[in-house]
């Protein structure tokens, strides 16, 4: 609920909430080119609200220990650096401060795939609990979907920059579209001249229309 509430306050549109064994997933509609700080805030409010909820319940009610174990297990699981868990999304956003959108997304998917493979193998070898195995399988399915959608997200990132006018304080000179970063306006260095981001994207999309 923390994600949904914060996202709505920041102007994001809530499409739906999906429930998984490892927690709820708020499907918020917003631009990929939204401020990194805003998106990080939305993601952080999920676990923060969960901790506040559990500690409030602990203060006012007497609950079985299982209640607290379950909630904190879900919290820790959701913070694993595996996309599309909150931990994986946060890792992607922090990488976006260092690298281009394309490279940060590719990197987090590589890291997620490696960690998930190790996690899945560990689960098969040391876990007999069928529910836990199902949870891990569901996570794998969602990760696979994100990997398949990676190129679509990159095209959406470029399309937004072409169709909408964003205001960024930072600028950067680059040579190709895959070097474009979030929170930056770009100038492209060509063999003959330096052209603006809009001009480069106009040339790029002219091949499709």
Per-range role (PLM):
Residues 1-209:
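Hydrophobic transmembrane alpha-helices and their immediate loop junctions
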């Amino acid at each position: 609920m923390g994600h949904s509430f914060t996202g709505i306050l920041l102007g994001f549109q809530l499409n739906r909430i999906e429930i998984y064994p490892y927690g709820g997933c708020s499907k918020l509609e917003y631009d990929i080119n939204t401020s990194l700080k805003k998106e990080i805030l939305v993601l952080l409010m999920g676990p923060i609200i969960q901790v506040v909820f559990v500690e409030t319940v602990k203060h006012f009610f007497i609950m079985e220990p299982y209640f607290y174990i379950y909630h904190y297990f879900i919290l820790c699981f959701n913070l694993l650096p595996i996309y599309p868990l909150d931990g994986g999304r946060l890792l992607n956003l922090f990488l976006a401060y260092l690298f281009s959108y394309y490279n940060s997304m590719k990197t987090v998917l590589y890291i997620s795939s490696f960690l998930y493979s190790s996690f899945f193998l560990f689960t098969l070898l040391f876990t007999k609990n069928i529910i836990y195995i199902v949870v891990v399988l569901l996570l794998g399915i969602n990760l696979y979907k994100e990997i398949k959608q990676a190129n679509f997200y990159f095209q959406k990132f470029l399309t937004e920059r072409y169709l909408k006018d964003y205001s960024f304080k930072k600028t950067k000179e680059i040579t190709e579209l895959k070097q474009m970063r979030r929170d930056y306006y770009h100038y492209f260095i060509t063999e003959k001249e330096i052209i603006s981001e809009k001009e480069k994207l106009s040339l790029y999309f002219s091949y499709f229309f």
